[in-house]
């Protein structure tokens, strides 16, 4: 079987042609299988984002009866997404959450999605792999945590998903050097600035990798470089589970139950096994029976659900006998530095992360910090650009001048690997949401290593922009990309799930989202979350074939 035939066999969704004249296959949604609550299905998945959708697709293809419940809507790109920053806030999880700590993390568009497709609906499309060193930071660098899985064990799933999305980019020289199935996209003005400045400083930079079609891919068109990747990608050139793995799962018999808020996981007090999930849909409380449960609500909602599922058998919260649920939550430091140029740059005219470098990713004994950071182009649209400028104290006439000058600015962003710490965690607050459930409280504080990384990344970005010819630079401090909160570990005293994402406490409960990642890395986490879920699905299907309950 050739490579293309193999991809076709694994994920036919890329070749499903629209059958009603729209980019969304409405027939698949209309005619999808629907289970009754009283049906004891094989698996119910909570959340249908990066991890939940891959698990759904893999297991449905293996013949399992699976339903995924998502708290948000089933998006239709034709009607729900617009080329408008202000008109896209409905894509984000904006329910109440509390933040605390010495360096609190604002919640919203940069780290929370709501709806089928999850946060990948509004991510920038950047899909790098983690490095081999990310899996052994405790052993090699003396910080962070070692994963109970290795990079070689995850590599086959990276390769599968890079074909399925697909990913476009130049050959990647860092970490485990590798190529990508699609050629890199043309470089826009922002990327040209980065490449020019990096070359003058002797810093290697490359184009990609992005999960954005470069050329037609099935029923998905070529990217038109419109700049609205973070608003859903109305043309469907950018891959997300909504247009890749979810349609394929529906075509093979899955059910996706949108606008279904799961409130609690039920556990048999006698056997200690999960029996299904309580959820609310259309204002009614319901219960879906299942032989197995997988949680994929991401790093805030997954710990919150586990803690809200306390019972007499698990009084401190489900899977929380050793006080691990909610701990070791991580973000990446994500400062952004912009530079002004006499010539027009028009940074929005390309995929936002078009050029990047991982030259500073690994620990360097000559630096005063452990681990590292990556740098990539970012392309704030006008409203976000106004926020950048206002953060510098500019207002009124000065702000208007910066806005008029928008097309002359280039912007770079760093992703700094902040370290996992047990005190950075999700707990339950006294406040309740509209369902009567305690809301999540996320407490976060940086350590000295985190701050040193951020300073170093800012300096490198400023140097690159000055080397490229910028006559002014400005920097804002940000966070990006939640992971952790239900991490995988070698034993239950140090984590919530094992190397296969199976919980230590409840034998038929899995967690398959970013909350299981033990470390953050300096790479965007979407592809790694999908790869971890694909590996868990492989384990489940192999175990079922071998008679393992």
Regions found by a protein language model. Give the residues of each.
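Glycine-rich loop(s) and the adjacent beta-strand/alpha-helix scaffold that form part
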Residues: 58-61, 65, 72-77, 81, ...
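A conserved FAD-binding loop/helix module that cradles the flavin
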Residues: 519-538
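Extreme N-terminal leader/targeting segments of oxidoreductases
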Residues: 2-43, 61-62, 542-549
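FAD cofactor-binding and catalytic pocket of flavoenzymes
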Residues: 104-110, 147-151, 320-440, 494, ...
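N-terminal Rossmann-like FAD-binding beta1-loop-alpha1 element of flavoenzymes
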Residues: 43-68
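Conserved redox-cofactor binding core of oxidoreductases
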Residues: 12-20, 139-262, 482, 487
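Redox-cofactor-proximal catalytic regions of oxidoreductases
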Residues: 87-174, 363-364, 422
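A glycine-rich dinucleotide-binding beta-alpha-beta segment and adjacent secondary-structure elements
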Residues: 15-16, 40, 207-211, 217-229, ...
């Amino acid at each position: 079987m050739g490579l293309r035939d193999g991809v076709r066999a694994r994920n036919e969704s890329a070749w499903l042609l629209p059958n009603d004249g729209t980019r969304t296959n409405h027939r698949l949604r209309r005619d999808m299988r629907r289970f009754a609550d009283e049906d004891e299905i094989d698996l119910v998945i909570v959340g249908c984002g990066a991890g939940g959708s891959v698990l759904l697709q893999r297991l449905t293809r293996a013949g399992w009866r699976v339903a995924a419940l998502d708290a948000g809507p089933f998006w239709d790109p034709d009607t729900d997404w617009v080329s408008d920053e202000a008109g896209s806030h409905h894509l984000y999880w904006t329910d109440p959450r509390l933040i605390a700590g010495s360096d609190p993390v604002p919640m919203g568009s940069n780290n929370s999605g709501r709806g089928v497709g999850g946060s990948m609906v509004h991510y920038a499309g950047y899909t790098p792999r983690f490095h081999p060193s990310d899996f052994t930071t405790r052993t090699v660098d003396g910080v962070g945590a070692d994963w109970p899985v290795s990079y070689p064990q995850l590599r086959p799933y990276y390769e599968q998903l890079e074909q399925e999305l697909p990913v476009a980019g130049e050959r990647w020289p860092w970490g485990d050097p590798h190529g990508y199935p699609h050629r890199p996209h043309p470089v826009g003005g922002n990327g040209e600035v980065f490449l020019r400045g990096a070359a003058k400083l002797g810093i290697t930079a490359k184009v990609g990798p992005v999960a954005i079609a470069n050329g037609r891919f099935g029923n998905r068109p070529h990217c038109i470089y419109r700049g609205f990747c973070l608003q859903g990608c109305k043309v469907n050139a950018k891959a997300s589970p909504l247009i890749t793995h979810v349609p394929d799962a529906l075509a093979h018999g899955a059910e996706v139950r949108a606008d279904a808020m799961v409130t609690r996981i039920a556990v048999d007090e006698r056997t200690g096994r999960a029996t299904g999930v309580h959820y609310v849909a259309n204002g009614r409380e319901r219960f879906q029976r299942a032989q197995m449960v997988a949680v994929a609500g991401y790093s805030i909602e997954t710990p919150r659900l586990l803690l809200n599922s306390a019972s007499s058998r698990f009084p401190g919260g489900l899977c929380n006998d050793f006080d691990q649920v909610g701990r070791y939550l991580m973000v990446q430091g994500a400062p952004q530095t912009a530079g002004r140029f006499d010539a027009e740059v028009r940074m929005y005219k390309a995929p936002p992360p078009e050029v990047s470098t991982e030259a500073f990713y690994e620990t360097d004994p000559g630096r005063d910090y452990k681990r590292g950071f990556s740098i990539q182009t970012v392309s704030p649209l006008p409203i976000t650009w106004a926020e950048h400028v206002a953060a510098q104290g500019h207002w009124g006439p000065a702000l208007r001048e910066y806005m008029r000058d928008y097309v002359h600015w280039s912007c770079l962003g760093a992703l700094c690997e902040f370290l996992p710490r047990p005190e950075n965690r999700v707990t339950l607050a006294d406040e309740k949401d509209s369902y009567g459930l305690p809301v999540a409280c996320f407490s976060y504080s940086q350590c000295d290593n985190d701050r040193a990384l951020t300073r170093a990344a800012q300096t490198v970005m400023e140097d690159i922009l000055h080397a490229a010819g910028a006559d002014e630079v400005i920097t804002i401090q940000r966070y990006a990309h939640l992971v952790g909160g239900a991490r995988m570990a070698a034993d239950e005293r140090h984590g919530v799930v094992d190397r296969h994402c199976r919980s230590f406490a409840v034998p038929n409960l899995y967690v398959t989202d970013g909350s299981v990642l033990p470390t953050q890395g300096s790479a965007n986490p979407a592809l790694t979350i999908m790869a971890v879920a694909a590996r868990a699905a492989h384990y489940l299907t192999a175990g079922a074939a071998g008679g393992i309950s």
